[in-house]
UniProtKB/Swiss-Prot annotation:
Organism the protein comes from: Paenarthrobacter aurescens (strain TC1)
Function recorded in the entry: Bifunctional enzyme that catalyzes both the deamination of dCTP to dUTP and the hydrolysis of dUTP to dUMP without releasing the toxic dUTP intermediate.
Protein family (similarity comment): Belongs to the dCTP deaminase family.
Pathway: Pyrimidine metabolism; dUMP biosynthesis; dUMP from dCTP: step 1/1
Xref: InterPro entries: dCTP_deaminase, dUTPase-like_sf, dUTPase_trimeric
Protein's name in the database: dCTP deaminase, dUMP-forming
Gene name, Swiss-Prot/TrEMBL: dcd
PANTHER family per UniProt: DCTP DEAMINASE
GO biological process assignments: dUMP biosynthetic process; dUTP biosynthetic process; nucleobase-containing small molecule interconversion
Subunit structure and binding partners: Homotrimer.
Signal peptide: none
Family annotation (HAMAP family): dCTP_deaminase
Residues reported in the UniProt entry to bind dCTP: 101-106, 119, 127-129, 148, 162, 174
Keywords in alphabetical order: Hydrolase, Nucleotide metabolism, Nucleotide-binding
Nucleotide-binding is among the record's keywords: yes
């Protein structure tokens, strides 16, 4: 069940949802706004002939930090990784979903391509999959609102929450935009 602002504040007060830094002004009727950090991962398209999810490709992306009060310019058709300014930690019976902001979507900014779900037990910065589908560059200002987290109460605590190691925990504790680690547990069914 999606939880309300009142319940979000109660879960934050009891430390079952932890957002650091926490700004009470970011709480909305059924979500909490999150801001973008100053770190981005850009794809180096000339390092590999193709992307292979089964292989480790350590030079596929490079980390860039925006300096001072400058924006990051996301060009039309460009895809980069960013991350939330906030660290997010969830109790074993709370999951979250990252959604974009309508006002930014109307400008052509997609906040996440596919990975908007955050498992119970997760702790770390949330990696953003940012795409510009507009025809003009978009300025991304560190500290600006970039999305919103909606929280869900599970019917019971997860038997193996994220970070327990049972189902994998490749991104537990991540800081900044984290490149894909799909090669670590790549699965392919022979068909």
């Amino acid at each position: 069940m999606l939880i309300s602002d009142r319940d979000i504040r109660a879960e934050i007060d009891s430390q079952r949802i932890v957002l650091e830094p926490y700004d009470p002004a970011m709480v909305q009727p059924s979500s909490v706004d999150v801001r973008i950090d100053r770190f981005f991962r850009l794809f180096d398209n000339h390092k590999y002939a193709h992307i292979d999810p089964a292989e480790e490709q350590p030079e596929l992306t490079r980390l860039v930090e925006v300096e001072g009060d400058e924006p990051f310019i996301l060009h039309p058709g460009e895809f980069v990784l960013g991350s939330t300014y906030e660290t997010v930690s969830l109790a074993d019976d709370i999951a979250a979903r990252l959604e974009g902001k309508s006002s930014l979507g109307r400008l052509g900014l997609l906040t996440h391509s596919t990975a908007g779900f955050i498992d119970p037990g997760f702790s770390g910065h949330v990696t953003l999959e940012l795409s510009n589908v507009a025809t003009l560059p978009i300025k991304l200002w560190p500290g600006m609102k970039i999305g919103q987290l909606c929280f869900f109460r599970l019917t019971s605590s997860a038997e193996h929450p994220y970070g327990s190691g049972e189902y994998g925990n490749r991104y537990q504790g991540q800081r900044g935009p984290t490149a894909s680690r799909s090669h670590q547990n790549f699965h392919r069914t022979s068909i």
